[in-house]
């Protein structure tokens, strides 16, 4: 819960201030809408997600399974763009808010008052930690979250005491509220319209699912139950704090103090801590807030380093160096610096972009749950939840389009890099292992000299006579001894959007013809992998026989990259050339 909390609970550092700037005196009512959506929409939704992805893959993996082939891969890239937006803005927003707490602390040195500079220094320190090597420390998270929640409880309790000691505050707030909004229905309607601006208070649910592999449980069912307890506990704690902090900050802090560069801007609870508990306690609160916000940035960086290598290299859509964390750290920090500069390290300005990333991920989870439920009656409730989040996301993007712009940049960058990487990596071997069935091994053992000769061909519904004719033509063309065994190898093309696979080869006879059969996303790479495996098993260099493929070479190359097929002979040779370094062990390719 505390690993989830460094992301989720740390938003208390800036959520009350952003809520007031968005909703004004309606902030408590708009926050109540947020709490209701948290408990009765997001929570049941992610309880379903936890059940569907017990290993922590979350909604992205659910949708990848639901949408096969290239459509699913493109969908994953789009969601990764929004997820990257979420994590990057978590880093920059957390660092900016930590800087705001530092700058407005009365003990801060006068020569270090630039919020931009401090934000960049915090981001630099974060990158330095990861460049040295960083492992999430559950113990640190427990200490930080425990202290932070305890301090917030103290400040909130004292602030509520101030409200009770000054009973005129609530009637004054009601008079001002009704002066602006004469009817209760009008207040509710406007709160529903304003709620999307507060949606960054929904962060943490994806993190809660992501930490599932760390949750104790004797089996998967118990882990799912414990995760659901975690989500419930975190949501209830956060809802209580969101509601109470919204009330006390609205009643006790003058509206002008929330404005840009105001003492309560981005640090409403810290302002109350200094105001009612003194600068010493307030400084302790500031330090606690700065630490948990910094750790929230570290959690976001860890999320990025877990998310990107999990998907892009596996799909062949990232360079090999993307598997290493340090180059990725430098890339992410460069982007974080740019985003910080673009938003001028302003906490409020980044709220919309952050909410966009959070809302798109939650909406994608809602869609995944609805689709996974099929025709069950329960899906109607989740369809309503999905409609709520679609509305919330659309309104947030309409009013604060900067989040969509940043996400679009990430999406276009990922798609561009992915296409280039997929093309450049297409002639890698891509076959993780070759599994020869007993039938295939028995047929191969019949070759007396164990110099295996393979005729590579596309699977077709041909008779034994057709195969006999093809074999005679190949033997005549290449002058093969009639006693030499020849095998047909047929590769049935599978999902071409997959990058790598295990090649399972079966043996089959049709008349006197021996046929090796396999299914794979890529034809040429599978032929190369089989030849390498045959050389390893027999100790002799195998031979493969091809027929030239007619057609445009550029079109053939395109078909190979995206459809897994093309002119197999030169492509197989190129895959072998890259995979086999010793020319004495290089299988021989014949083509005519």
Q: Language-model features: where?
A:
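Extracellular loop-to-transmembrane helix junctions
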Residues: 16-64, 71-76, 92-122, 147, ...
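Helix-loop-helix junctions that connect adjacent transmembrane segments
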Residues: 146, 153-203, 398
